Amino acid sequence: IILGIPCAFGLYMINNKITKCFVFICWLIMLMPPQITLLPNYIGLRDMGMLDTRIGVVLTMTFSTFVVVMVYQYLKGIDESYVEAARMETSSIIKVIWYIVMPTIKPAVLALFLFSFTDSYNMLEQPMFFIKDIRKQNLVIFISKVADTGKMFFPAAVIFMIPLIIIYMVVVKSIDNSILGECKGK
């Protein structure tokens, strides 16, 4: 999300045919199954010496075309005059993003955080491919190992879901408050 928002903002500000072509390529990449990128990611992590590390798995999730496309589409709904007025007031594009764009796209960012966290939390193939040490692998793989024993599968699955449920409740409440705040402000 941290890399996707500035990228989407750049695409929003530079509105030409090349930008539209790049957004279309992002749409096409979103249509590909994520397993296609396993081998290039494996080769990259191997060359950097980051196999069998948790940082290597996190590194493969740092950029998402889903975030870029969704934030770009959300930004298209913002009136450009707000951004242009903010750019006239300050020379820093970071301040424009932080003080003008981020409060406006807060509901979208929160929803994307929820989707990205759930996707990362339920990740199966990447930890299996990139991490061989069982102690470093995530809970999904642990539960699949516990499923072999049978008795502990359902309690482990319930415990596994607790962080997702808590984050879901917090994020949904924040999204509702953001949307209600926007409605009251108008």
What are these regions (language model features)?
Residues 1-186:
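A structural signal for multi-pass alpha-helical bundles of membrane permease subunits
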